[in-house]
């Protein structure tokens, strides 16, 4: 397959960064005037990730129709997506208003609520304990009907009710839960299986409104999801995988929302996902067998994502740089969620990824041995501290053995005294 050869050549030459920069320079740039209005500042998660004016979703509100979301229409593929940022606490109602007004049936979430100690998205759907949430600002109620937790994703069945008309609709919430922080999955297998589960639900069909896709900024992982889906759809329609140019498709999508695909690594992963998906479409038995294994959805996580070991139980007072965490408010220990321009997005993610890789690689067996030695040393030190009883018994023992300690010294003194006295007496007798 031509695309696979292209991938291998780029990989061998290490040209992903250069190709990514070319895409960035060729990408369209359109005005975002509405997003920059002062009244909309608190509706943007990142100050420099904004929807273009010509493709932004407009809410049916008289006072303010703004939401940080873009409609992406891929004509040949006959596919439409709404890409949006992770909802903020003050925009959760707007998010569900958009879902209602656009008649969307599915929501795809590609991030976790908390990542790297930073809040990436508000909790905009009810959890098991709550069962329902009411959004008074938009007159909507959301109820959790069921939750199906798989090894690398979760599917939630939600009911969205318009409190004014009492009309209800079923919404499917597809939550991919194993995308590594500041990186990409090692293998596209589980990601593609997740994509095909979304397809099978009918949420992407023309019978419904555009599917809503989000991560944190709504451009990186979200762009990867939509790019892979569109390319695979075009391959299937054309019956010629080699005719699909991923770079060209991405540039077309960037006409509707800025910054889709944030890093060179995400671009590389998109190629991998499309190549793997194309093999499945073309009937590659090895790929199909692998996907059958994933489809069993047993309790074991796929090999590409093994979670870190559980953290030890939290101590009452945990020192941090000479301070105790519990003496400070919790927000002081969470990095501030800000984001500069698209360059800084990529740089920040790249730095975090490289530092994460460095920290993982530096966790050598020697490090673990040293940690255990330090722990053992502390335990030994604690064990060697005598108790009060031990101290008192030791003192008594010293008192009991006092004569035995001084006896040799006293004997020597007495002997020396006797010898000196004898010598003196001999001297007196002999010479006087």
From Swiss-Prot:
Alphabetic keyword roster: Acetylation, Endoplasmic reticulum, Hydrolase, Membrane, Phosphoprotein, Protein phosphatase, S-nitrosylation
Function comment: Tyrosine-protein phosphatase which acts as a regulator of endoplasmic reticulum unfolded protein response. Mediates dephosphorylation of EIF2AK3/PERK; inactivating the protein kinase activity of EIF2AK3/PERK. May play an important role in CKII- and p60c-src-induced signal transduction cascades. May regulate the EFNA5-EPHA3 signaling pathway which modulates cell reorganization and cell-cell repulsion. May also regulate the hepatocyte growth factor receptor signaling pathway through dephosphorylation of MET.
GO biological process: actin cytoskeleton organization; cellular response to angiotensin; cellular response to fibroblast growth factor stimulus; cellular response to hypoxia; cellular response to nerve growth factor stimulus; cellular response to nitric oxide; cellular response to platelet-derived growth factor stimulus; endoplasmic reticulum unfolded protein response
Expression by tissue: Most abundant in testis. Also found in kidney, spleen, muscle, liver, heart and brain.
Residues modified as Phosphoserine: 50, 242-243, 335, 362, 364
SUPFAM superfamilies, per database record: (Phosphotyrosine protein) phosphatases II
Pfam family, one: Y_phosphatase
Organism: Mus musculus (Mouse)
Name this protein carries in UniProt: Tyrosine-protein phosphatase non-receptor type 1
Residues that bear S-nitrosocysteine: 215
